Curated annotation (Swiss-Prot):
Belongs to the Antp homeobox family. One of its GO terms (biological process) is anterior/posterior pattern specification. Residues 30-44 have a biased composition (Basic and acidic residues). Residues 1-53 are annotated as: Disordered. It is found in: Nucleus. Keywords: Developmental protein, DNA-binding, Homeobox, Nucleus, Transcription, Transcription regulation. InterPro entries: Antp_homeobox (IPR050296), HD (IPR001356), HD_metazoa (IPR020479), Homeobox_antennapedia (IPR017995), Homeobox_Antennapedia_CS (IPR001827), Homeobox_CS (IPR017970), Homeodomain-like_sf (IPR009057). Sequence-specific transcription factor which is part of a developmental regulatory system that provides cells with specific positional identities on the anterior-posterior axis. PANTHER family: HOMEOBOX PROTEIN HOX, HOMEOBOX PROTEIN HOX-A5. This is Homeobox protein Hox-A5. The keyword Zinc-finger does not apply.
């Protein structure tokens, strides 16, 4: 290869060639990919009980963009115990809004963070608002149907 010619890349690097040889055919590309896959499986120790093979149908369908959910990724959904839910519902029944002091007390009593308590109450208020809107609409519709 001439010193001034940098258009040729070794096919051993897995990047293919840019000179018009027969290695540019689609079949050759498939053979190169097959060699790379076999080589990478050997390097990962696949035969020694490594991670299971991931087939194309097991991969994610949607491409995620970098740093949308922050560096940690998507937060897992909190699963509240029945006891926690019952206590939160009881508190909501008496007061739909919490003071900071009461939020801290509940968080310590239920072993949850203040943030979880705050968000639970926000979500519960939205549910309450939606339920009341549906009730008022159904009562208005029922009242209109029974007029003499």
């Amino acid at each position: 290869v001439a010193v001034g010619s940098s258009s040729h890349i070794s096919s051993r690097d897995g990047l293919g060639t840019s000179s018009g040889t027969e290695d540019d055919t689609p079949g050759a590309a498939g053979r190169r990919e097959g060699k790379f896959t076999a080589r990478s499986e050997r390097t990962l120790g696949r035969a020694g009980g490594g991670p299971p093979q991931i087939y194309p149908w097991m991969r994610k369908l949607h491409i995620s963009h970098d740093n949308i959910g922050g560096p940690r990724g998507k937060r897992a959904r909190t699963a509240y115990t029945r006891y926690q839910t019952l206590e939160l519902e009881k508190e909501f029944h008496f007061n739909r809004y919490l003071t900071r002091r009461r939020r801290i007390e509940i968080a310590h009593a239920l072993c949850l963070s203040e943030r979880q308590i705050k968000i639970w109450f926000q979500n519960r208020r939205m549910k309450w608002k939606k339920d009341n809107k549906l009730k008022s609409m159904s009562m208005a519709a029922a009242g209109g149907a029974f007029r003499p």
